[in-house]
């Protein structure tokens, strides 16, 4: 709620979370959430608690690949990193890369979010964000700095 109040719909929690919390599904510490817990579950494996589907009134509709899942999460994080630079929260792409690696555990072999954006290509990142924006809404809208850099063919390094 705090992030949503300060930053708007980009950080709005899905309505499903309210239903899960109301049902006492707070995860591992209470052994009830999205997944099954306890002795019946093999250690190191995550099994979906299928009763969650009825609670949320949904049916699973296929599987996303690991790559699709990680890409959808990653593009939002990359967009927010650039937004931090755009808003002056960080002074440089280098500061953002160092901060992300040491502060939030961004994979060092990718060089940090800004170095990683350069390796992907800003135009490709903007295209991914636009595609997700069409599917999932404004939380995937590319920030202005990304749009202008893509238009001008610029990079961070």
Predicted region positions:
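N-terminal glycine-rich phosphate-binding loop for ADP-containing cofactors
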Residues: 1-157
